[in-house]
Amino acid sequence: MSKHRASRGKPTVTTTKRQTSPAARKHLKEAERLIAAGQSQAATAQFQRAVDADPTNVDLRYKFGKHLLGQHEQELGILQLERAIRLNDRDAAPLLELGQAYTATNRFAAARGLLEKALEIAGKASQTHLIYGTFLHKQGKLPDAVAHFRKALTLMLECPVEATVPKRKEDFDKPEVERLLWTTLSQLALAGVHAFAAFGTLLGIVREGGLLPFDKDIDLGLPHNELDLAARCLVANGWAEVPHAFAVNPRSFLHLKLQVTIDVTGFAVDQQSGTTYEGIWIEGIPAEWNRLTRWDTISLVKANAPDGSPIWKLEDPEAWLRTLYGDWRTPDPDFDTIIAAKNLCGFSLMTQCYALGRIYARWESGNLRKALAAARHSLRHLPDDELLLEVEQRLSGMTSEPSQRRESAA
C-alpha cells in the first residue's frame, strides 16, 4: 500500500517511488534525454523498453502514460495509467492523471470514482482540487466547480511558487498558416457561410498586418445558425472536429495536414432585444451561468482574400476590436479575452471557473505576471473577494509590483 501523504498546501502530487531496476533506469534516463532534446516521439520507444524491463513499477507506468497523453496517444496513455492503478490504487498521481484523461474524453462516470479517491488520499494538495474542479466544470456543475477552484487557490497560498520567464511560442505567423486562413474563409463563403476573422486573428490582421506570432489558433466568427453548415464545409476540406468538446459554442476543428486548430464561434441575436451575444455555453444549465459577451449589430461586407478569392469581413473591424479589447492598438501580452473582454456580461460562474483556473495554472507554472494580471482582471468584477485580494497581494509581492485595488467594472 502506498505511504503517500500530501503535505499541507502542496501544489502537486507525486507517485510513491520504489527502486527502479538498472535496465529500466537506463531506458528512462535515455527517454528523458530525448524529451529534453525535443525528440519526444523517439522517447516513446525508450519508455516502452523501461516498462518492459520493470513491468510492476507504478512510477514508470505513470510517467509513460503521461508521456503518451502528451503525444496525443490518448487511448495508449490511458492503458498505461490503468495498469499503474491496478498495481497500486492508492497512489494519487496516477488516479489524478487518469481521472483527467477520462474527463477529457467525457467518461465522467469512470473519472468520478478515481478523482473522489484522489480527494480522499490527497485532499490537501491544491492540484487535486484544481483537477476535480475541472471535472465538475465540464459537466456544468459550476457552483461546485468554483468551490474547488477556490480551494485550490487557498491551498496554493500556503505553498508559493518561484517566478520563471516562460518561453513563448512565436511561430504561428507562418505563411502557410495565413494562406490556410484565407483559403478557409473563401471555402466557407462559397459554401454560403458568413464567416469572418475574429478575436486574436482579426487583431493580428488589423494591427500587425498578419497573424500574431504567439497566437495558438485561428479564430472565426459566424451566425450561430450557420455552425452546422460550417462544420460540414470544414470537414469536407481537410479539417476534423476536435472530439469530446463539452461546450456547444464555440466548436473547434483540427487541420489534419498542418495540425492547426480553428475555433469557430457562433454569434446569436436575441429576438426580443435585438442584442447580439457570443460566448461559451453548455446545454442544460441556467443561461446566466454561461460566459457571454454583448455586441452591437455585426455588419459584414463582401471582400477578397489576398489571392482574389471571395470572403466575408467585418464592415468596421476597428470598432469591433474596440468593443472587445478597449485600447486594441497597444499590445498587452497579459490580456486574456476569456476573462478580461471589455464586453463581458457580468462575471458569471463559468467565467469565474476560467479565471480561477487560469490564475492557478499560471501561478503553478511560475508565470506570475500572467497570474497577477488574471487576478486583477477578476478583481475588477469582484472587488471585495477576500481570496482574490489575498492572491493579488501575494502575487504582487512575488513579482515586486505594488498591490492595487481595481474598481468594479461598470
What are the roles of these predicted feature ranges?
Residues 209-230, 308:
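Catalytic metal-binding acidic patch
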Residues 35-46, 70-83, 105-117, 139-148:
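Structural signature of tandem alpha-helical TPR/SEL1-like repeats
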Residues 173-185, 189, 235-314, 335-363, ...:
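Conserved catalytic core of two-metal-ion nucleotidyltransferases
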Residues 185-218:
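Active-site nucleotide-donor binding segment shared across nucleotidyl transfer reactions
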Residues 21, 55, 89, 123, ...:
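Short coil turns that delineate tetratricopeptide repeat
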Residues 104, 124-130, 134, 138-197:
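Helical scaffold of the NTase/Pol beta-like nucleotidyltransferase catalytic core
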